[in-house]
């Protein structure tokens, strides 16, 4: 609970979708798969991927602009921009590119990497700047361009991932609408889901080498990721509800990382939460990593599902292994 006499509220949200739709039928022309095979295992019908003219920064700028418009703010009103991503356009950071693209000249900007938990982690990090009074308004962008790093010959992974970005604007206020949060890491499970650097040693002199190389395509142990998610996500949601002195019946909505419909169904069943309270758009967008939760959140807000005062559980989980959850009041 906040003990500093200062809280925060989400005052705007926005999304940006990549410009190319890739359907299950399209994928069946690339690898040995079918619409029935993909839908029965993942719930996905299509996903969107970036063309050569798009990148993470352009998606982040578009999502940020929409979030600012909903909030009724100008880019110059922002104090801080946090980008959650695992697929930056530049390894030195992409948040600064988004800051420049928005024209948010007053805002400090930095990247964080926490894979599919990244947006929730970014929300919890931003909250600390607001609660202490250091900043008044923060833009959080969750975005990934995973199509760059997919092995398009591997049908177990290439069917899963899409590209996109989602954003929210947080503003400091007296009442705290972030009621509780939890974050965890288990590095012993790191090998379950990877986008790894592979070094190729190159000689500099007769005695010295340098490990130059590149990143390899995404690899995943799907069975282990499923076991991890259905065990840890219900547990962390129960923990944040306990911290907030709430129960599952108090929740109006649950927004999970949109990894796979089977995982979301299993989490809902274990918590006894009706499926109509669990927001899902995985069928339309696939797994967009750090973008998935803000994409689902913004869509539900704009469709009029989420209303002022609603209690929402957000939970992300993924590579690391990391998992994080928050309870927010809209």
From Swiss-Prot:
Question: Which Pfam families has this protein been placed in?
Answer: ACP_syn_III, ACP_syn_III_C
Q: Where in the cell is it found?
A: Cytoplasm
Question: InterPro entries, alphabetically?
Answer: ACP_syn_III_C (IPR013747), ACP_syn_III_N (IPR013751), FabH (IPR004655), Thiolase-like (IPR016039)
Residues the record marks as active site? 116, 257, 287
One GO biological process term: fatty acid biosynthetic process
Q: Which reaction does it catalyse?
A: malonyl-[ACP] + acetyl-CoA + H(+) = 3-oxobutanoyl-[ACP] + CO2 + CoA
Record's keyword terms, sorted: Acyltransferase, Cytoplasm, Fatty acid biosynthesis, Fatty acid metabolism, Lipid biosynthesis, Lipid metabolism, Multifunctional enzyme, Transferase
The answer on whether this UniProt entry bears the keyword Transferase reads: yes
Q: What PANTHER family does the record point to?
A: 3-OXOACYL-[ACYL-CARRIER-PROTEIN] SYNTHASE, BETA-KETOACYL-[ACYL-CARRIER-PROTEIN] SYNTHASE III, CHLOROPLASTIC
Q: How does it assemble?
A: Homodimer.
User: Domain comment text?
Assistant: The last Arg residue of the ACP-binding site is essential for the weak association between ACP/AcpP and FabH.
Q: What does this protein do?
A: Catalyzes the condensation reaction of fatty acid synthesis by the addition to an acyl acceptor of two carbons from malonyl-ACP. Catalyzes the first condensation reaction which initiates fatty acid synthesis and may therefore play a role in governing the total rate of fatty acid production. Possesses both acetoacetyl-ACP synthase and acetyl transacylase activities. Its substrate specificity determines the biosynthesis of branched-chain and/or straight-chain of fatty acids.
Concerning HAMAP family, the annotation shows:
FabH
User: What is the protein's given name?
Assistant: Beta-ketoacyl-[acyl-carrier-protein] synthase III
Task: Tell me the name of the encoding gene.
Answer: fabH
């Amino acid at each position: 609970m906040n003990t500093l006499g200062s809280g925060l509220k989400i005052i705007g949200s926005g999304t940006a979708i990549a410009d190319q739709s890739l359907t299950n039928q399209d994928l069946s022309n690339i690898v040995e798969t079918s619409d029935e095979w993909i839908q029965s295992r993942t719930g996905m019908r299509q996903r969107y991927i970036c063309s050569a003219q798009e990148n993470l920064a352009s998606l982040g700028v578009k999502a940020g602009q929409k979030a600012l418009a909903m909030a009724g703010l100008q880019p110059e009103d922002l104090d801080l921009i946090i980008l959650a991503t695992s697929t930056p356009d530049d390894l030195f950071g992409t948040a600064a590119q988004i800051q420049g693209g928005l024209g948010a000249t007053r805002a400090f900007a930095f990247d964080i990497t926490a894979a599919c938990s990244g947006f929730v982690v970014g929300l919890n990090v931003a909250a600390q700047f607001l609660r202490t009074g250091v900043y008044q308004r923060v833009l959080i962008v969750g975005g990934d361009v995973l199509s760059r790093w997919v092995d398009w010959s591997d049908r177990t992974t290439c069917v899963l991932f899409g590209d996109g970005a989602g954003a929210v604007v947080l503003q400091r206020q007296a009442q705290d609408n972030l009621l509780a949060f939890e974050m965890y890491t288990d590095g012993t499970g790191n090998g379950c889901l990877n986008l790894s650097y592979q070094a190729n040693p190159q000689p500099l002199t007769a005695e010295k080498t340098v490990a130059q190389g590149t990143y390899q395509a995404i690899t995943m142990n799907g069975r282990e990721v499923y076991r991890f998610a259905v065990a840890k996500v219900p547990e962390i949601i129960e923990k944040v509800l306990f911290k907030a002195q709430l129960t599952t019946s108090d929740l109006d909505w649950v927004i999970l990382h949109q990894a796979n419909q089977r995982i979301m169904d299993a989490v809902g069943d274990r918590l006894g939460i009706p499926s109509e309270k669990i927001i899902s758009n995985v069928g339309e967008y696939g797994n967009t990593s750090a973008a998935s939760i803000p994409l689902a959140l913004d869509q539900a807000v704009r469709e009029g599902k989420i209303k002022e005062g609603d209690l929402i559980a957000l939970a992300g989980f993924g590579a690391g292994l990391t998992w994080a959850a928050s309870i927010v009041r809209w």
